[in-house]
Amino acid sequence: MSGRARVKARGIARSPSATEVGRIQASPLPRSVDLSNNEASSSNGFLGTSRISTNDKYGISSGDAGSTFMERGVKNKQDFMDLSICTREKLAHVRNCKTGSSGIPVKLVTNLFNLDFPQDWQLYQYHVTYIPDLASRRLRIALLYSHSELSNKAKAFDGAILFLSQKLEEKVTELSSETQRGETIKMTITLKRELPSSSPVCIQVFNIIFRKILKKLSMYQIGRNFYNPSEPMEIPQHKLSLWPGFAISVSYFERKLLFSADVSYKVLRNETVLEFMTALCQRTGLSCFTQTCEKQLIGLIVLTRYNNRTYSIDDIDWSVKPTHTFQKRDGTEITYVDYYKQQYDITVSDLNQPMLVSLLKKKRNDNSEAQLAHLIPELCFLTGLTDQATSDFQLMKAVAEKTRLSPSGRQQRLARLVDNIQRNTNARFELETWGLHFGSQISLTGRIVPSEKILMQDHICQPVSAADWSKDIRTCKILNAQSLNTWLILCSDRTEYVAESFLNCLRRVAGSMGFNVDYPKIIKVQENPAAFVRAIQQYVDPDVQLVMCILPSNQKTYYDSIKKYLSSDCPVPSQCVLARTLNKQGMMMSIATKIAMQMTCKLGGELWAVEIPLKSLMVVGIDVCKDALSKDVMVVGCVASVNPRITRWFSRCILQRTMTDVADCLKVFMTGALNKWYKYNHDLPARIIVYRAGVGDGQLKTLIEYEVPQLLSSVAESSSNTSSRLSVIVVRKKCMPRFFTEMNRTVQNPPLGTVVDSEATRNEWYDFYLISQVACRGTVSPTYYNVIYDDNGLKPDHMQRLTFKLCHLYYNWPGIVSVPAPCQYAHKLTFLVAQSIHKEPSLELANHLFYL
């Protein structure tokens, strides 16, 4: 099937004149309209080209990708859907006060800055109509902005909706303009709404304003963030470039309008798509090249450095070459080769390369068909890192060394950004035109909750480092361990010696932990994935408790085929270890300890506990991600504790296709988890606290309207008597605010256990931040918690302290993790299924942490 046919098959309609090979009506570059206060005549701030005259000479815009007011400044409109959700007013116990009081107070500085504006500031929303109607959004904007009534006003316009910070004299204003063709266009501007500064629409406008401001600082928007290509950091040994930049946001925090910014980096490969395709062809051969190439490239994001724009590769058109022609807006035809020579003085060297196809998002209020951009692989640079690259330790170390910032370094970068905005004449003018001014950087008071004691079988340890008790795990007996009597080790001839050496170390380490490990049956296999699976099929019987595979390489097919068979087809706990990992003799004790911990858990063992004051409490972790092979399939991982000590778990993973289906499967899971709890405890839990991770922007409403009712329904149906009390907490590891302590005129990471529940939180939500990890180098990130439903009525102090306790119970690491253990377990489960298994694991493994 040709690229043209595939595009049609995927529902991307071509224009009528695009049926001939090489003739497409769509431009190679997207159209653009900037939301500046003089879009019709000025440059976009970083390309130096006129929107109307210069670009129209070629019939092609070289400016910003044409997204609308609602889309362009706010890359995803869903970002602001959550702002209209108010959950706190329904929670009586925190309606008046949601802050805790226990713990040691600590002064913190943040990456949040006050934005000052007049008390009577309002935003005026108008609707603009044109008679006769105009299809061109750019022409609509140009005609409207040519009038003196709007020339000196701060404004944002998407072709239909106009926002002004100053009210027009009349509710209905009528204007007229004449086009270059002499046609008279009548425009009617009608006032629709007067919006207070707290309106979600105003928040969108504020964010668009600051995105315009960063463009005035010669920064480029890629995705949601802005980057500075003039200050690249090179990693030549790995052919990578890093563009420094910022993620920014404007929002209300506890009734204050605040500007937040954090440092960001864009990873760019110094490798063109053509170079990638050439290398791939050499590896795979011509027979399966096109299929492999499409599989690896479609869906990736590329950067065209001649205009610093990013595009998604939606297809590859093998029938179109750079020597083919396309039709410009003025009706003339030009070859791609000649176009790039004329427009950018770029000479295309390979005239036989295929063309990449990118679907340009259809503009809001634009009635034209969705357009396709044809891009030349030779001029497109790959962005991001491949899975192979992320597994390259040396590469990731080199990237980390460039991007890791100390708290003081991060603070300096943020201070410089704010200073640049205030010093830049155009940026400052943009702010002042809208009536905005930068205020002070926010300082606040947090609290440090007490550290936890780790409960072992015959020992209570207070770790020297509160975040790590790895030394204690080697010398103390774990809570409970099942003996490993019948098990298999699969290895090749080449790795047999290292297997024997490792086995001796493993048995010594496990013995000191109280985990009895007998000698296994060692089976030698050939070094290919199919041989491992055949050996498993041959030797695994009902008595085998665990299968260990020592893999000769990190080739993904080894791990995937073994895990898929032993998780679904023949459910037996499995342990995969790379042979090269076992060759690190100086680290053998540490490696053996970690593997012994994992094996214990996979057999149903319990490693340690913390004191849980609440009796009869079930905690649940839920995570959702997309399947790596089928992007329309969502993998839902659910993990629930089944004993009061919160050391035993019930895990299940379900594959679904819609968010409604996700809500439905949560009821199925909760029913199974409650049955399991009843089986072990002969009663239902008095309290259930659900930690919901994997929540995207704009999904709070779905959680509240669909998921919470399903959870409540399963709880209510489980007992005819009194039902368990339920709380649901949304967990987000990625959040904009950062916190620092000031010591000796410098800033440092806050202490472990720091809680922030004021000033940087939302007034309409019951929320808090918790720092439950230690950053030896770099800057620590807080985790954000939003309690969206709460029947338990716990005091904020108790909810925060319980959450901190749960961060100690992740058995894959003898230390504290950044999220509660059930969340991390659910993440590990979904990752295994989404990346390797691609089907639901057998319920026979549900009582074990088989995915560690």
Curated annotation (Swiss-Prot):
Biased composition (Basic residues): 1-11
SUPFAM superfamilies xrefs: PAZ domain (SSF101690), Ribonuclease H-like (SSF53098)
Gene Ontology process terms (BP): cell differentiation; epithelial structure maintenance; meiotic cell cycle; piRNA processing; regulation of translation; regulatory ncRNA-mediated gene silencing; secondary piRNA processing; spermatogenesis
Keyword Cytoplasm: yes
UniProt-recorded name of the protein: Piwi-like protein 4
All residue ranges annotated as the PAZ domain in the record: 272-384
Pfam families, sorted: PAZ (PF02170), Piwi (PF02171), Piwi_N (PF23278)
Residues covered by region (Disordered): 1-48
Keyword Transcription regulation: no
Annotated organism of origin: Homo sapiens
